[in-house]
Amino acid sequence: MNKNVMVKGLTALTILTILTSLGFAENISNQPHSIAKAEKNVKEITDATKEPYNSVVAFVGGTGVVVGKNTIVTNKHIAKSNDIFKNRVSAHHSSKGKGGGNYDVKDIVEYPGKEDLAIVHVHETSTEGLNFNKNVSYTKFADGAKVKDRISVIGYPKGAQTKYKMFESTGTINHISGTFMEFDAYAQPGNSGSPVLNSKHELIGILYAGSGKDESEKNFGVYFTPQLKEFIQNNIEK
C-alpha cells in the first residue's frame, strides 16, 4: 500500500481505552491524522435520533450504516478489527441525543471481491434490552451518482478521543470508476465505513481510505454498483 494512503479506521497498535458508556473498547492511534485539502465543512450531530443519523452506528475504531433488519454495512478492515476487542456496535450514539443501544455482533459476511466491504449482522436485542430495528432507520440505496454531485459523510472520527461524538461533513464527488470513488468531504480516522450519502440522504457507498503526505488531500470510497447493491440486499436478514 502506498505510504501516503491510509485507511480511516484506528489501528490496533496503541493503547486500549475502555469506554464503559458505550459498552465496548476503543484503541487510539498514536499516528498523526488530519485532513488539509479536503473541503472542511463539518458539523457535530448532537441529536442523532432522526433520519439519516439514526442509521449510523459506531464500531471499534470505525463506523457503519444500517441497511435493513439487523443488518449493517461497513468495511472489511473494520469488521475484522472489531474481533480484536469486543463484538459490539453502538447505535447512533451522540453527545446529547438518546443513543439506540449497544448490540452484540452475530456474524460477518465479507464481500468476496477486492472491495473493502462487509455485512455485519447484530442480535436484535441490545445489552440494555432495546430493540435494534425500533431504534434505527434503514438507509435507502441511491440509483447512482456522478462526478460533481454533492455528498455528505456521517460517522465517528477519532471515536474515543471525541467520546464518540457524531460528525457530518459535506463535499463533492471528484471521480467514479467501477466500484471506486474519490471525493473531497473531510474525514479522519474512525470514518472508515461511514455512509456516503447524496442530497436526498440516499446511500451511494462507504468511505474506506484517504491519501496525502501529512494530511489527507483526497478520500476514497466503495461506490455501490448494481452488483454490490445486489450482494448487500441478498444478505439483509429476512
Swiss-Prot record:
Superkingdom of origin organism: Bacteria
Principal place of residence: secreted
EC class (word): hydrolase
Disulphide bridges, residue numbers: none
GO biological process, one term: proteolysis
InterPro entries: Peptidase_S1_PA, Peptidase_S1_PA_chymotrypsin, Peptidase_S1B, Peptidase_S1B_tx, Trypsin_dom, V8_his_AS
Induction section of the entry: Negatively regulated by sigma-B factor.
Gene Ontology MF annotations: serine-type endopeptidase activity
Gene3D superfamilies reported in the protein's UniProt record: Trypsin-like serine proteases (2.40.10.10)
Any one of the GO CC terms: extracellular region
Keyword vocabulary terms for this entry: Hydrolase, Protease, Secreted, Serine protease, Signal
Compartments it resides in: Secreted
Family per similarity comment: Belongs to the peptidase S1B family.
Protein name: Serine protease SplA
Organism the protein comes from: Staphylococcus aureus (strain COL)
